[in-house]
Amino acid sequence: MSDFGINLDAICDNVRRNSSNSSIKSQVSNRSSRKMDFVDEDELSTYFNSKTSVTQSDSCSNDLNVKHSIIAEAVVCDESAHVSADAVQEKDVVVPKMDESVMKWMMDSHDGICVNGGLNFSKLKNKSNEHETKVTSETNVSAHVSAGINSQLGMFNPIQHKIKKEAIPEMFEDEDTDECTCRNCPYKEKYLKLRKKLKNVLVDIITEM
């Protein structure tokens, strides 16, 4: 009877070899059996060219044209509110308005300045007596400026004007008379300075028109 020997080293090598081959085969079979999902080119193009979903960081394309189009078409969002800058944002338009106190002063002023669809400058020379006020002479210098005043913008929109430059000084020729009732008023000096400044502004406006 012959000796029957078992080579354990050879068996171990075969087991290791078979196990490694089986693991490789299983990995290959798993890879081959796995469903390969590819991205549709139309959907990808739609994504990259969509302003609602693309940001400036989505510039990973290797195609320079696509990359530049992504950056150019990317939406700029607010960091806090994430609001698209492409959306129409309504802004409150600030409408400049004349102060009511200035308006009232112009309406009630004895200088004859009134605003009623235009600027009408009329001047009356008044002389006061002790018992009565008598109008000795009346000088009506009417510089009617037909100006379209846009109430919304609060600006002068000159349409037409009829005035001579040499007639401008005549409007204010008797402004600085001392015959007014407020000659002893402590604010008279300040009032005269302010009135003179307003006159200069009005003269400049009329001259420029």
Swiss-Prot record:
Its main location: host cell. The keyword Metal-binding applies. This is Non-structural protein 5. It comes from the Viruses. It is found in: Host cytoplasm. One of its GO terms (molecular function) is ATP hydrolysis activity. GO terms for cellular component: host cell cytoplasm. It comes from Rotavirus C (isolate RVC/Cow/Japan/Shintoku/1991/G2P[3]). Its cofactor is Mg(2+).
